[in-house]
């Protein structure tokens, strides 16, 4: 007996369609007008979006006029292209040239995320040629360049204010307007090679600057007025400045000072200093720290890779950071909650550490990439490169490794019933000729693009921009 769907109500048909995947749902919408009405129901596509992705903001897509259906189809199509990585069909590669020195850092001034389909990606790069340059990633064009000054050492961005900050070898910190590249403020530290970190705490934007002499400056953003200065590592360079995702905690370390413990600060005590009391800080019970990262979904947890006293092997330790209040004072409490030994032996200053979620750790050393749980269980291991991994970029969708072998490797997260979150290696992105370059040195990503710096043989580094087609 033939089935007559006209006997079904619209609600019944929508319920039946809720068991279909996107391809079947699209085919069902083409059967007849009644089926089309059911198949394009926003509730169906909203459910599919929320099952596929943790967070969706359809109101931000397509200037706020998008539907759940168009949102799902666009995002799913883009992610399929980011998984297959076919040159020309899935992405466009452009070379960004203009620097006459080495690229020391690159940051996204404006990036595209999963909810915005039409916004342009703008990357800014700093170089030893003394300039900052802004690039349109999709068009492959330079938007502006600052006048040359002393060789630059570092760059960071306050995306909320649209302001860039750089430090140079003469000890000068500069603030640049993101739209024009105009210098809006400067501050002299009298110390070369400052490490920079911009962030907002309690609705106040600040810039942290760690100097080559071991001092930590807290400056207002973007005016660069000094709020506080503290000497932390006498004569040793501060080269680790990391803020927790909720901006409550600040990690400060000096890799060269192997016998001194890194520090963790209560951020508000630096940005809103008290005349009567020193900032709240605590030394961590480790030394010779090679890498550090907070957990995105558990911002009070800090992960450190450090060397043991006998320097025989490296250890990964996880600490919980909290406030301990008594009647007369407030202290920072640091508690070790996990620790395990890593497979590589000896001191490895080249180790890279990134985190994802509340319990996933990504560690790169040499040409090897490994994914761990907080308990030290290895979820995945890769050796896709023939030379060391120089830089690492991790987000909720993928991991990108940049290697001295002049290739990028793209890996995507995958959920498995038995293992939970794991990583799947996808494809290589090549960087050009080995005769003209010495490999990739840095990498940055937004949702629709990847930008990496190539160290050139002639000293004029080039950026490679990979823009995925939506």
Language-model-detected regions and their locations in the chain:
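Loop/turn segments within WD40 beta-propeller blades
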Residues: 107-120, 156-161, 198-205, 242-248, ...
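Inter-blade linker and blade-boundary elements of WD-repeat/beta-propeller domains
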Residues: 56, 77-98, 141-154, 182-198, ...
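A generic tandem-repeat structural signature
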Residues: 133-223, 227
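C-terminal interaction modules of eukaryotic adaptor/scaffold proteins
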Residues: 387, 391-392, 398-470
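WD40-repeat beta-propellers
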Residues: 106, 132-136, 173-177, 216-220, ...
């Amino acid at each position: 007996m033939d089935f007559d769907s006209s006997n079904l109500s619209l609600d019944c048909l929508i319920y039946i369609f809720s068991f279909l995947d996107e391809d079947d749902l699209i085919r069902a919408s083409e059967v007849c007008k009644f089926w089309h009405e059911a198949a394009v129901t926003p509730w169906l596509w909203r459910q599919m979006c929320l099952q596929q992705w943790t967070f969706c903001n359809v109101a931000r897509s397509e200037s706020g006029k998008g539907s759940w259906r168009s949102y799902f189809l666009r995002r799913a199509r883009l992610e399929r292209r980011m998984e297959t990585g076919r040159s020309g069909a899935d992405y466009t590669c452009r070379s960004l040239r203009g620097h006459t020195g080495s690229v020391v850092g690159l940051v996204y001034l404006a990036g595209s995320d999963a909810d915005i389909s039409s916004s342009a990606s703008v990357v800014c790069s700093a170089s030893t040629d003394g300039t900052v340059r802004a690039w349109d990633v999709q068009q492959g064009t330079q938007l502006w360049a600052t006048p040359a000054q002393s060789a630059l050492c570092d760059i960071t961005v306050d995306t909320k204010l649209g302001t860039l900050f750089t430090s140079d070898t003469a000890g000068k910190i500069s603030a640049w307007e993101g739209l024009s590249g105009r210098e809006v403020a400067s501050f002299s530290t009298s110390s070369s090679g400052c490490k920079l970190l911009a962030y907002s705490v309690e609705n106040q934007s600040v810039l942290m600057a760690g100097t080559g002499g071991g001092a930590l400056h807290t400056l207002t953003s973007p005016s660069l007025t000094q709020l506080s200065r503290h000497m932390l590592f006498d004569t040793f360079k501060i080269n680790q400045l990391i803020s927790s995702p909720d901006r409550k905690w600040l990690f400060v370390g000096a890799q060269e000072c192997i016998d001194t413990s890194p520090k963790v600060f209560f951020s508000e005590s630096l940005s809103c200093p008290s005349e009567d009391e020193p900032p709240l800080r605590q030394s961590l019970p480790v030394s010779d720290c090679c890498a550090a990262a907070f957990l995105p979904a558990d911002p009070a947890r800090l992960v450190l890779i450090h060397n043991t006293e006998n320097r025989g092997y490296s250890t990964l330790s996880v600490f919980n950071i909290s406030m301990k209040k008594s009647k007369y004072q407030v202290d920072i409490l640091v508690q070790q909650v996990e620790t395990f030994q890593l497979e590589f032996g000896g001191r490895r200053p080249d180790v890279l550490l990134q985190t994802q979620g509340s319990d996933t750790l990504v560690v790169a050393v040499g040409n090897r990439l490994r994914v761990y749980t907080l308990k030290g269980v290895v979820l995945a291991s890769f050796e896709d490169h023939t030379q060391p991994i120089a830089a690492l970029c991790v987000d909720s969708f993928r991991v990108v490794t940049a290697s001295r072998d002049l290739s990028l490797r793209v890996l995507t997260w995958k959920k498995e019933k038995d293992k939970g979150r794991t990583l799947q290696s996808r494809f290589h992105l090549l960087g050009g000729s080995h005769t003209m370059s010495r490999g990739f040195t840095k990498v940055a990503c937004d949702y629709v693009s990847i930008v990496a710096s190539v160290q050139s043989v002639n000293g004029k580094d080039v950026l490679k921009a990979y823009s995925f087609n939506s």
